Every structure is written in C-alpha cells, then in structure tokens.
From Swiss-Prot:
Transmembrane regions listed in the UniProt entry: none
Keyword Protein biosynthesis recorded: no
GO BP terms in the entry: ribosomal small subunit biogenesis
Purpose: One of several proteins that assist in the late maturation steps of the functional core of the 30S ribosomal subunit. Helps release RbfA from mature subunits. May play a role in the assembly of ribosomal proteins into the subunit. Circularly permuted GTPase that catalyzes slow GTP hydrolysis, GTPase activity is stimulated by the 30S ribosomal subunit.
Domain of life: Bacteria
Lineage: Bacteria, Bacillati, Bacillota, Bacilli, Bacillales
GO-annotated cellular components: cytoplasm
Residue numbers binding GTP: 114-117, 169-177
Protein name: Small ribosomal subunit biogenesis GTPase RsgA
Length: 296
C-alpha cells in the first residue's frame, strides 16, 4: 500500500503528499479512526488506498515521534522560535518557556530574534546581543534577522532541508513576515501590532505544511497553550541543556537543584557557569509544576 505525509487537514479531508509518486492525494478518514479515537494530524505518516489519481482513503496512521496539541501537528523535527527585539519587547522568560516545551517534545529548537532594525537605541541592541551570546554558549542555534531587510535569513534556511519545521513564538513577533521573506510565494497574511493592546493578532487559521528550501515548513498559530501539563518535576532539568549536563555531578540522584546540599547546579550558578536568569526561570517553572492540580 502507498504511504505519504499529511500536509493539510481541512473539512474532513486529509491531503497526503506521496513523494515517491510526486503527487498529493485528497483522502477521507475511515470510521475505524473514530472508533479507536485516533485523529489524523498534519505531519502524520499515513498508509492510504488510492481510488484514482487524486482521491483515496486513509488506512493507517504510523506511530508518531512527537505530537503537539496546539498547533495540532506531529512528527516535528525542529521549531524556529521567533521573538522580536521590540514590539513586543524581548522576554527571556517567555523564550525559556518555549524552549522547555520544545525540548520536552524532542524537537530541536532554533532561536530567531527579528525586528532588530527597530531596536533603534544602542542599549537595547547591546542587551539583546548579550542574550544572543548567552544562548549560543548553551549550544542553541541563534539568528538575528530583520524581515523587512531580508537580512540574516540564510542561516535559518539552511536548517530546512529534509526536515519538518514549525515556526512558533509570541503573537505579533513577525512569524508570517519572516516566512514570507523566506518564501515570497506563500503570501501569508500579516497584521500590524494592535496599538490598543500592544500585541499582535493571530493571522494564521490552520496548520499546513508547505514545501520550501528542500523541506516542509508549517506556519502555525503559535503555541496558544504554554502550560507544562506533560512535564513532571524530575523531568524539568533535562529541558535545560546546561542543567542537564551539570546535574550528573550533583551528590544526590534525583536532585531537583532547589534546597538539596552539594548541588552542582547551584554551585555552577554561583560560579557564573549557568546564567542566574535561566536558573530563576527553572525555579519559577518548577513551582508552577508543583502547584499544578493532580491529574486523575
């Protein structure tokens, strides 16, 4: 049976890209999916049965490597986390929240800071470039871009080949503008910042995977849920690469790096090996997880 990847889901139809035959098949789901409570997602690898050259039925959904609830997409290889230098203001707390979420899902993060052309005063630019160095030192890929000038895009595009990539980030940071600059044929709608609220309006309605630069890219509505619902206390440290690396030297196994004695992570913070603001965010997120209502 032929196989392909679902690149769009709309009104009960699933559009399957069969690269071996270089065509897209419009498929319906079978009742067995509803019976087994399986919802096919954009990004799923699917086995299908063709009725003709253009239409068919989904028969099976292959096992997923990961699955995001919002946006509903699966088998994501990497996420370009788009944050603006200004309008809205750059936030390391929000960036770290996104990083934790993608790391927890086994997705490779790429950080993109856009609108650098709007950070007019030298102090703002200097502060942001300092953060860029911090995140690069941790091991993250970080790119500084200006969508209007099309600068800094080459570095991001080189990551797309043979990958499924999502763009995510705070509303109003220019995700659609950035994708339009990368692939002008997308013609994705963009909205200016709402002057009343100081934040952007979501302009993307549904998730669709689009061929560009040798890979598949989704312009998503961003993560509308930023809660750590699937992350347990003992798992949080593994989503901070620098904590994950140093925690092996903690005296106690299962150290949460809070009040435990002889904690290598706390020592690394004191000695400047781990940025204090990253550790503060770790503690904030840990508290959030601890206060989460028990799940039954």
């Amino acid at each position: 049976m032929p196989e392909g990847k679902i690149i769009k889901a709309l009104s009960g139809f699933y559009y399957v890209l069969d690269e071996s035959q270089d065509k897209i098949i419009q498929c319906r789901g079978r009742g067995i999916f509803r019976k087994n409570k399986i919802t096919p997602l954009v990004g799923d690898y699917a086995v299908y049965q063709a009725e003709n050259d253009k239409e068919g039925y989904l028969l099976e959904i292959k096992e997923r490597t990961n699955e995001l609830i919002r946006p509903p997409i699966s088998n994501v290889d990497q996420a370009v986390l788009v944050f603006s230098a200004v309008q809205p203001a750059f936030s390391t707390s929000l960036l770290d929240r996104f990083l934790v979420l993608v790391e927890a899902n086994g997705i490779h993060p790429i950080i993109c800071i856009t609108k650098m052309d709007l950070a007019a005063d030298g102090e703002s630019k200097e502060a942001i470039l300092s953060y860029v160095k911090d995140y690069q030192a941790i091991g993250y890929d970080v790119y500084v871009t200006s969508s209007k000038e099309n600068s800094g895009l080459t570095g991001i595009v080189k990551h797309f080949e043979n990958k499924t990539t999502v763009f995510a980030g705070q509303s109003g940071v220019g995700k659609s503008s950035l994708l339009n600059a990368i692939s002008p044929e997308l013609e994705l709608k963009t909205n200016e910042i709402s002057t009343h609220l100081g934040r952007g309006k979501h302009t993307t309605r549904h998730v669709e995977l689009i061929h560009t630069s040798g890979g598949l890219v989704a312009d998503t509505p961003g993560f509308s849920s930023l809660e750590f619902t699937g992350i347990e206390e003992e798992e949080l440290g593994s989503t901070f690469p620098e904590i994950r690396e140093i925690s092996a030297s903690c005296k106690f196994r299962g150290c949460l790096h809070l009040k435990e004695p002889k904690c290598a992570v706390k020592q690394a913070v004191e000695e400047g090996e781990i940025q204090p603001y990253r550790y503060e965010h770790y503690k904030e997120f840990m508290q959030e997880i601890k206060e989460r209502k028990p799940r039954y």
